[in-house]
Amino acid sequence: YMRMRTGRQVSGSDNIDAGGAAYGHDQIYDHCSFTWGTDECFSLNNDKQPKGLYNITLQNSILGQGCQNHSCGGLVQTSDKEGVTIYLLTIKLVILR
């Protein structure tokens, strides 16, 4: 159970993900929430590492809103040899005014 809320930065890079991985294997992200990233809220990118990024599971988690106009909930960039499993429940949020 982890909550990641990046938020706007006072100094430094404006493109920060709330969570994710650039390399590694056999990782499970379960019951996590990722919001307020200034780039993506959660990203998986093999980052051109020799061993890549594989056997990654994201489940029962929330990918929320980003802080910038270009921010997106998630970004997954892997090669066809790598295994990524994403299991998310889709919930429609209605805001009444």
Each model region followed by its residue ranges:
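Right-handed parallel beta-helix
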Residues: 1-6, 23-39, 49-75, 80-97
